[in-house]
């Protein structure tokens, strides 16, 4: 019988035996404003929880810790497609974390997609936004609209090359737009 009772030293609290590592993914526009989803900023929070055991020497009060539970994977998170914008990352990749890993924050940034810009003399410009790729948030889509037909004008690309009519027998059906630039956030002029 121990009349003084066992010695329970410091170091056996919940925080000494449990640890959580968090990865927070935020989605923002170039100017820093958050991408909204259902009326709130879109944020993905992933957590990995780790535990370990402790043994107490009841005579000396010394605490010895076991190893933290094994490493865990925080799953890959696909970036959403945001209409009219391109993301700088298609995914935030899977990452392995241990109890010693620091909390992390990942930011996915969206830039506005550019437009085909018909420059028609005497008319206001009416830009045609590049389409989104429905599955890859980092790329524009492949569907192409038509450049408008304007009587008396032949539309040209930025290098002065005439655009091809959609229907070679009837240019009134419009013209094939030029290919997109390497950076899909840049506009493509169509000069008349």
What residue spans do the PLM features occupy?
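Extracellular modular ligand-binding repeats in secreted and cell-surface proteins
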Residues: 1-192
